[in-house]
């Protein structure tokens, strides 16, 4: 998922299994919290263009509005599109994302929801290179060359929805409940390469 839908990334150090549950690989330390964007008190309309070599152009539209007599309803929209050739030869990448953040805030309660869909497609992408047994580390290859052939590709789609509610029980105590779902679909034809001799064959 493209990061434009997030307001900030929080890195929480230390054990967090009691609060966030155990990760799939069983580690108990730390967590990364992705905070999605919300509409601010002032209207926001921001259009950002981007360019990356060799010829990848893109745009990002960020809109935020609040409605209601007390500005209690908020809408935040983020749309992203990038497409073109990368700095590596025979490599291209295309990214798109639409994300919608909705919220309602009252005197002592708040409700928010997020919906998003993102796609990530590319050709000729490099997945790393390992050394076969007995092969010494060679000099570094040219940084502008992809090890994978141009027909190697991946095509991924992410979809998700999140819902959260908060209630201020007292001035010092807040109760909350949150739920979410996500689905990732990935089609790929590529793999890591292995260097088999000093001549550079893999």
What do the PLM-derived regions correspond to, one by one?
Residues 26, 92-98, 128-138, 191-201:
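Flexible, surface-exposed loop regions and adjacent strand-edge segments
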């Amino acid at each position: 998922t493209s990061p434009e839908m997030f307001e900030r990334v929080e890195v929480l150090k230390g054990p967090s299994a009691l609060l966030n549950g155990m990760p799939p690989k069983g580690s108990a330390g730390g967590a990364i919290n992705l905070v999605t964007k919300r509409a601010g008190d002032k209207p926001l309309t921001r259009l950002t263009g981007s360019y990356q070599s060799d010829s990848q152009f893109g745009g990002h539209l960020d809109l935020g509005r609040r409605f209601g007599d007390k500005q209690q309803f908020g809408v935040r929209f983020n749309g992203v599109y990038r497409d073109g050739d990368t700095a590596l030869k025979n490599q291209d990448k295309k990214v798109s994302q639409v994300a919608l953040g909705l919220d309602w805030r009252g005197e002592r309660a708040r409700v928010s929801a997020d919906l998003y869909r993102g796609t990530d497609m590319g050709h000729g992408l490099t997945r790393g290179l390992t050394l076969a047994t007995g092969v010494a580390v060679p000099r570094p290859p040219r940084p502008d060359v992809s090890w994978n052939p141009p027909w190697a590709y991946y095509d991924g789609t992410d979809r998700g929805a999140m819902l959260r509610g908060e209630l201020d029980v007292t001035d010092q105590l807040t109760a909350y409940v949150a739920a979410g779902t996500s689905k990732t679909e990935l089609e790929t034809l590529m793999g890591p390469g292995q260097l088999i001799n000093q001549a550079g064959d893999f």
